[in-house]
Design a protein with these regions (language model features):
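Active-site cleft segment of glycoside hydrolase catalytic domains centered on the general acid/base Glu
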Residues: 149-155, 185-221
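Substrate-binding groove of N-acetylhexosamine-processing glycoside hydrolases
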Residues: 2-27, 31-33, 72, 171, ...
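Feature activates predominantly on carbohydrate-active enzymes
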Residues: 1-184, 219
Length: 601
């Protein structure tokens, strides 16, 4: 039996709440994430930007803690002023778990939650006073040791517990307009907190049941439930973001004025070269598109990685989908990287801010990219807007053709329930230069000369960008950093697509050494990690081809071999390898984010 934290509402009260939800069901929703200020003072080499670093927030009240909260509120005020001025009408923050009290939590943790509730109430007011509706993220499901023990003893289901938790939470925080539910990804290995989220929704039917149990609570309190379809590919639910039948199993026939579906624009993470997700056209439920303006795989705003023309194409296509009511702009969230520019606050975050401004003008107002860039240049007091537009066109070209390898990026590849990312050599803040990457690229790329010519042209474009920067009124140092970083990629491409010689190894090692000297580890500008090695990869090209043809497919639908072998037997094989031969699995793959093992669940 589900317990509630308040008495029943009157029929007239429920009717008025239902009316409120229905009235705003199709109202535009333009969300932006506001977690940046909470990373102040988070001094680690690689930052987990996936959520607020709760373990570093003040746990007591003293002068230092008060100064920290004052700084956060000052930053949030600056952020909210800018977001509201640009036209956003909602923000996302982390998270329900750290603000919802419950009797089953550890006593010392409840004391800390009481402190967080008091401080976040002040933070929420900053947004609501400026017309920005507050939405809080929530992973399903997050445990503490004591909570897990109590739920096990009481045989309490996750859905039942969450429904009770939200019922009380909504009463405590009437200023919170809704929740943003994530079921397909949980805390990574870099999260060190008493609360730990884990994946508990494994089947489409479980996701649907979760919605059926939580939506009535949201309707009762007139709050939105924004349900994210993003997953990392684990379990049967792992293809929710792109598989039409899984998507239909979860959402078909659902009718609730509280429900909004949130989908990333593509069938993978925030990469280029991805077609628009066709699930936008498969339901009339209100939905928003997720867009990232601090591109976690493309430098995080350390250099221009302009998204304007990319998002303009998606916006054009989305006009033909029913009930797309807005967008969720991730301007800070995402990635395990050393880069630390904070959007809408730091003056150095100009490239993130530019992407964010242009994205909203495209998605909300239907502007063309060039007009949006000119408006941003005028607002920020930059230089020649035409020079800036030219610079951004070159940047778009360089990112697409040198950060990515175009011929590989254009290929549609699936492994198990995941669409393979179109980027192979760069991952977050790491550049991989080694023989295994070389062999893979030479297998997938059939026109290496074109790739080499493209790299040379891009290096010329970077010099043109540096020359344009003073006229455009943007930081020359950012463009020089981009040239130095992409110069390593151009040299790596030469290594990848030509025969190996000792001379190319020497040039690469010298280039890496010079890069590290120019951008020291604890210097003012974070650098990429160059993971370099020239040990020959033992697998012959022919066997690589066999492995690719066996394990990967070039269409969305599953093959017979996928259903018989890849989705089931391969999981068992991986578990045996992880147990008996853990050294076969690269350390980076094991320790990054949730770890590669999640793909094999």
């Amino acid at each position: 039996m589900r317990t509630t934290l308040q008495g029943p509402r009157s029929r007239s009260s429920l009717a008025s709440y239902a009316g409120l939800l229905h009235s705003r069901r199709l109202q535009p929703l333009h969300l932006i994430d506001a977690i940046g200020p909470f990373f102040r003072g988070h001094d680690v080499r690689t930052i987990n930007w996936s959520k607020i670093p709760w373990q570093n927030l003040p746990k007591t009240r003293d002068a230092a803690a008060e100064a920290w909260w004052v700084q956060v509120r000052d930053d949030l005020t600056k952020f909210a002023d800018q977001a509201a001025a640009w036209g956003f009408n909602a923000v996302s923050l982390d998270d329900v778990t750290h603000l919802a009290d419950h009797a089953w939590l550890e006593p010392e943790l409840r004391e800390r939650i009481a402190l967080y509730r008091e401080e976040f109430t002040r933070c929420f007011a900053i947004f609501t006073e400026r017309g920005l509706a507050v939405h809080l993220t929530m992973d399903v499901m997050t445990y503490t040791p004591e909570l897990r023990r109590r739920m096990t003893e009481a045989k309490r289901s996750v859905n039942d517990y969450l429904a009770e938790l939200l019922d009380g939470f909504f009463v405590s925080f009437p200023q919170v307009a809704g929740i943003i539910v994530r079921i397909g990804e949980s805390d990574g290995k870099g999260v060190h907190d008493e609360f730990r989220s884990e994946l508990v929704i494994q089947k489409p039917a479980q996701a649907r049941r979760l919605l059926l149990d939580l939506l009535p609570v949201c309707e009762k309190h007139a709050r939105r439930l924004i349900f994210r379809t993003w997953t990392v590919g684990a379990y049967r639910i792992g293809d929710l973001m792109w598989h039409r039948r899984t998507f239909a199993s979860v959402f078909e026939g659902l009718q609730s004025p509280a429900l909004v579906i949130s989908m990333k624009y593509g069938e993978s993470d925030f990469f280029r070269y991805l077609p628009l997700n066709r699930n936008f056209f498969r339901t009339s439920i209100p939905k928003i598109v997720e867009l990232q303006t601090r591109r976690e795989y493309e430098g995080c705003g350390e250099y221009p990685s302009f998204t304007g023309w990319e998002y303009e194409r998606y916006a054009r296509e989305l006009k033909h989908a029913d009930n797309v009511i807005g967008c969720m702009v991730w301007c800070q969230t995402g990635g395990w990287v050393p880069f630390r520019r904070i959007a809408l606050i730091d003056s150095e975050a100009i490239w993130i801010d530019l992407n964010t401004f242009v994205t909203l003008r495209i998605m909300k107002d239907g502007w063309v990219v060039e007009d949006a860039v000119r408006a941003f240049a005028q607002e920020r007091g930059l230089g020649d807007a035409n020079a800036l537009i030219e610079l951004l066109r070159y940047s778009d070209e360089v990112v697409r053709e040198l950060l990515y390898v175009e011929e590989f990026a254009q290929q549609k590849l699936f492994f198990r329930r995941v669409r393979i990312p179109p980027m192979l050599q760069v991952y977050w803040g790491n550049i991989f230069i080694n023989h295994s990457v070389k062999k893979l690229l030479r297998y997938f790329v059939h026109e290496p000369e074109a790739a080499l010519h493209s790299a040379a042209r891009c290096m010329g474009r970077l010099e043109q960008m540096i020359a344009l920067a003073p006229r455009a009124g943007v930081p020359v140092a950012d463009l020089e950093y981009m040239r130095d970083t992409f110069g390593l990629l151009a040299l790596a491409r030469e290594y990848n697509f030509t025969e190996f010689t000792p001379e190319i190894e020497t040039r690469l090692r010298e280039a890496k050494r010079a890069y590290k000297v120019k951008y020291p580890k604890r210097g003012l500008r974070a650098r990429y990690r160059i993971k370099m090695g020239f040990q020959p990869f033992w697998l012959h090209r022919r066997y690589i081809g066999w492995a690719v043809e066996l394990l990967m497919r070039r269409r969305r639908g599953y093959r017979i071999i996928d259903r018989l072998l890849i989705l089931h037997v391969l999981s068992m094989i991986y578990r045996v390898i992880a147990l008996r031969k853990p050294h076969w699995i690269p350390g980076f793959a094991k320790e990054s984010a949730m770890g590669v093992d999640v793909v094999f669940r």
